[in-house]
Amino acid sequence: MEYPKFKVTVSCMTFNQAKYITDAMNGFTMQQTSFPFVCTIVDDASTDGEQDVIRKYVEDNFDFSEGSVSYHKETDYAHITYAQHKTNKNCYFAVLYLKENHYSQRKPKMGYLSEWRDMCEYEAICEGDDYWIVPDKLEKQVVFLSENPDYGMCGSRAYNLTELTQKIRRAKGSYRNNDFNSVLIGGGIGTATCTVMYRLKLLKGYRDFVGSQKWLMGDFPLWLYLLRDSKIHIFDEAMVVYRILQESASHFKSYEKAKAFQDSVRSVQLYFAHAYDETAIPKIEENNFRNQFYLALSYARTKEAINYAKHVKITFKDYLIIIKSIFKRAR
């Protein structure tokens, strides 16, 4: 198959997001670009009917006429559909409907996308429950990265949509327009994953470096690897909506799951610190105790909070957060 010279691949990993995936796909197809881009949507054997939602959307909006570039094929692991949008001629979808759930088996999925991903210069990410709201997101990010070779990635501000209340507001966040060390110590880039675009060439060697690590998140170690020799820029414009669900890959009903996620963040930090900057370890540990302290408070786990408080220097700001947390729980 001869493909266009795709400049950007949009990676959308999704599972049981039947209620939300149409918003994500609308955000992709609305993108107005000066280059062709391919959206690789991987449904991880959803059980809520999401695959049917995706199929209908693709059938209704993409060109399957005689002489079109579209195709369907089956492999050992998936049913695959590739097609060009009917009206947005720069937009292509490559959809993989996986036959069995890979996440539960800890089986990697990114290798399935090499057919399209390997030819691209940049990659953007948006999971199935989030969505983009501006039509020039991809264009603006490509222009910025092409004009600023010292930057390896860029993101934007976001709106947070709380699913339980349906309230939407501009995320506050601490936006770090800087380097590897601040992201390593800070524990993140300060904005949502669905805002990000990065240079694919900077990922060379990533899989070998990570090896068999079983971290509970895929984005944070990716950001650190990208930022070893580059910087990140955050646009002040809110370009996306990040959906806050009661239970998701990074939001949890149970304290035990939330604590395990924070433990995994620390594991990533220490892994990279030992490889690149051991002087950051004391600050990483200090921040971890503080984060665990706040986490225990937010779940009303007083005993655990007291244990972590022994390692934290309590400031006036901390007391305000504690009071706010107690008041919130009391309501």
Model-derived segments and spans:
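A short, glycine-/small-residue-rich helix N-cap motif at loop->alpha-helix starts
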Residues: Y77-H79, N90, A94, K99-E115, ...
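Short, well-formed alpha-helical segments that are part of the catalytic scaffolds
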Residues: Q17-M30, D52
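Catalytic core of nucleotide-sugar-dependent glycosyltransferases
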Residues: W215, Y242-L245, F252-A280, T302-I314
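Conserved nucleotide-sugar donor-binding catalytic segment
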Residues: S156, A171-E256
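Short beta-strand-to-loop acidic/aromatic patch adjacent to the donor-nucleotide binding site
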Residues: C120-D129
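Cell-envelope/extracellular polymer assembly enzymes that use nucleotide-activated donors
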Residues: F6-T9, V38, P221
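Acidic donor-binding segment of Leloir-type glycosyltransferases
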Residues: T29-L96
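Conserved donor NDP-sugar-binding/catalytic core segment of glycosyltransferases
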Residues: D136-R169
